[in-house]
Every structure is written in C-alpha cells, then in structure tokens.
Amino acid sequence: GPNGNGVVHSAKPPTHWSEKNNIRWKVPIDGAGASTPIIWKDKIFLLSVIDTGNVDPSLPRPEDQPKRVFDITHPNTTYEYIVLCLDRKSGETLWRRVATRLIPHEGTHRDNNYASASPTTDGKLLYCWFGSAGLFCYDLEGNKIWERNLGEVKIGASLGEGCSPVLYKDKLVILRDNRGQSTIQVLNAKNGETIWIKNRNTRNGWATPAVVEHEEKVQVITTASRPEAGNRKTPGKVISYDLENGKVIWECSGLTDNAIPCPIVENGVAYCMTGYQGFSILAVPISGKGDQSKNILWKRELGTPY
C-alpha cells in the first residue's frame, strides 16, 4: 500500500477470481521475477531477468560444480536484466529496456531469482534495483537518467538478494545486509550520488526498511539479523536511523535470525519480526532515543513469518 503497511483504504479489489472470472487481461512475461509490480496512473512497471543461454566456457558448468546447500549452482550464462512498462488498461507493452547484461556472480535459491527487489517511483522517475547487478533510474517514458554499480555482495548459502529500495522525496534508501560487510546508504535520487553510508553489525537480511516521519525527523526503521548465526547470546535488532545523516536514533534487541518480514509502523509503534531459528515479534514505540530494549511495549515468540 501507499504507506508500506499492507493497507489501501480506498481499494475495492475483487474477492473472487479464476482463470476466466474477474480477469480483465492476461499477458505472458518473459523470464523470471519475484518483485512486486508497481502502478502509477495508467502504467504498470515490473522487473524480470532472462537467461540468454550464452555460455562462458571459462566457467564451470552447473553439473560440474561442488554440491552446495539447497543444490544451488552458480550461473555460467549471461542474463538480461529487464525493465518493463505495461499499459494498465490493456496489458500492452509500452516500453521494454535491458538495464544490463551480465553473468550473475552467485546463484540463488530456487524460490528466488535475480529480479527480487520491487521498483519504486515518485511519478517522475522510476528506480530499479537489481542488487549486485546495479541500480537504474529511468523516466516514465523509459529514458535512462542514471545508473550505479554499488558492488557485489554475497548472501549466505547463495540464497540471493531481495531487499527493495525505498524512496522518500529526494532520497533513496538502499539496505544491503549480507555475509560480508552489511551497509545502509542513502542516495540522492536525482543523480544517484551517495549522501551517506553506514556499516551494520548484522548478517544476511531481506527486509525492506520502513521510512516514517516522527517529531520533525524522518526515521529509517530496519530489522537486523543476529551478527553471529545461531548465537542466541547476540540477538538481532531493530535499528532506526535519521534519514538526513545516518545517525542511530534508537535501537532495541530481541529478534532472531534472517530478517525477512518488513517493519510495519502504525500510530507511533513499529512492529518488527523474524522467524528463523526462533520466532520473535516486537512492538516498539518509535519516540524513544538510544537503547530501547527495556521499553518494548510487548513481545511474542511464536507464529511469526519466515
């Protein structure tokens, strides 16, 4: 929804549909994509990746690679990273752009792929984040405005990247939690230049931050996995940053591993959760400063999503 909390008060979606009922149109989309399409007026924007099948003979074939967890293999073929714009009324392709072509540096889980981050727009510019393959900015007619390569990261067990960019006015938030040096950074949305970047003491994560206004400040609320996988003595955290400068406004401990669900903020309370190697959901007031671990409104340790 428009506030990132799963709610659209003005929506009137159909409650029943099938292959034939309540379907206005249906069109095939080439490739694979796990990101959510977005809508601006009469345009739909979505991302996809296509395996071209063009093999680099210098790289090992998937069947010749050592066995990895979940049978994940590293590609040896070139992929095209696609940005699509469809007509909302008809499904017709208005424009299609190949953002980049490259061989991904690592594999992904079978339930993930290389187009997992959802695009975002302010109605003027469109921001498309393909993780280690790059960040691309277009106008709504498909003209490329700028692009940036923010470097490669490696995700534990090669599960793949998945955190989406968040746009607030003229700032773009990029969170990159991984098995190396995790970071959060804010870019100038007009030209892609870095405004600030901060290191994070956490590991793999896929949770998109929540950006909220509170008491004349804009907070970037993030969840963070345990810095040491499986070590219950070092719990995961909720960390709130000042959008302007990256300073930590408040934080609290109490999460488990693999931060995947996005924080939800409602009526001054952040609801944050993790669901791997234990369950945890925290309700934390966003009005605090510093360590808020003892000021949690409530906590539950069951039934959280993963």
State where each predicted segment sits.
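Noncatalytic, solvent-exposed loop/strand surfaces
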Residues: 1-306
